[in-house]
């Protein structure tokens, strides 16, 4: 079965490096795509305001709880146990694709950082590929020249509830990942197992048709 995975708040959570005080003239002092393990501190650019500095420190402390990759303009936090989830989908024979509301350049960076190509990732659908501001509906895929797949054998995983409402038998809602203290490895493992089980139900229905 084909599965389309959302990126932000589904697989990852990212913030602009500017929120930690860095700018193009003073870029984040780590090479893009450097992977930082959970527990390693983030670099913060100090400003002139104590309130701003305190806010940046709090943000850095929160993000340091998660495995991260430094992109060109963002710091990307990995959803805990994400690799186990992706390994499971691949081992079960799912064809992995990505559908994101983000821009193509940003999405390409995330795909590279997560090494989704190693899972045989097929399609990358970004903001430019479907009606602006609309809910992700699988039927839009039929209008893309690159998409030659039966929608009856397709599912989508997304954190936005309206995506699930738009196609209740083909979508799996996932709790948004916001890189908060509530996103523990245990809770995220349970959530991703639930998503995997929901996909298996959809796949089972597809096989019986």
UniProtKB/Swiss-Prot annotation:
The keyword Hydrolase applies. Keywords: Hydrolase. One of its GO terms (molecular function) is hydrolase activity. SMART domains: CPDc. Residues 1-199 form the FCP1 homology domain. SUPFAM superfamilies: HAD-like (SSF56784). The keyword Hydrolase applies. This is uncharacterized protein 037R.
